[in-house]
Amino acid sequence: MRPVAAEITTIDNRTSVGHSFWLSPRNGWQQQPAPGQFVMVALRRPPTGFGREVCDAVPMSVAGWEPGRLRLTVKDLGPTTKALLACRPGDTLTVTGPLGHGFSLDAQRPLLMGGGVGAPPLLFLAQQLAARGGEPVTLLGGATGDEIFHRDEFPGTVEIATDDGSAGHHGFITDLLDGRSPDRLYSCGPEPMLVKALAWALANGVPAELCLERYMACGVGLCGVCTIDRDLVCQDGPVLSSERLAQSAEFGKVVREAGGIVRHTPA
């Protein structure tokens, strides 16, 4: 998959912590994305103290698709995302993708659960499921109400949970799982949340597909830092099945950071 230069045509979904871009390349996208797939976005930043220009590439899940243009949602999480949020319509980004393995689209009574920046790829998924006759129910969680992206754009029923109680249920998003009986659970967000989602799915006999957020440097399987067990999240994922993750020795326990440094997460 070759990188393409894509122009920012529109900015929408503005919040205090981020917003969305619509991107259009001059010659069109090489391939239509599927929900759950991602792109690598490269951005050149001003020279460092050593006088060298910095070029960062970050993975970003696809939040929407229309013929000729693709949507990404960015949250301020560090220097690269802050630089992306400073871009304006007419600016150009270098984009590679779509990449990875996405969600299936066969559920009729799907339950979607997104935490933080896990909401954008689920918006794309919910729209695709609804277009196929599904009746999605979506659970969205965040630290505050202002950190819940796309809350008014999801088709079907939407329920909210916030850490501070500023919107919806005051507590964890996983508190909202009780009493549900979907034919499939789809989830994206922080790994501790996904661990709880997996446990609920296995305990209730609900097939699940979880979209992992792992550190990636290349997005094409060369660097290996997104490895989980023997799988590469950038190629075998980012969406992995509950059957696969139930057998994992590393899910929820081990992550790899920049340079491949292994970090064990609290149980």
Q: What residue ranges belong to the model's regions?
A:
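Ferredoxin-reductase
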Residues: 1-89
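Structural signal for conserved beta-strand scaffold positions within catalytic alpha/beta enzyme cores
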Residues: 10, 64, 160-162, 210, ...
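Short, charged beta-turn/beta-strand-edge "cap" motif at the junction between a beta-strand
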Residues: 44-48, 96-102, 252-253
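FNR/FR-type flavoprotein reductase catalytic core
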Residues: 79-217
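Local cysteine-cluster metal-coordination motifs and their immediate loop/turn environment
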Residues: 121, 191-192, 213-239
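Short Fe-S-cluster ligation motifs
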Residues: 229-267
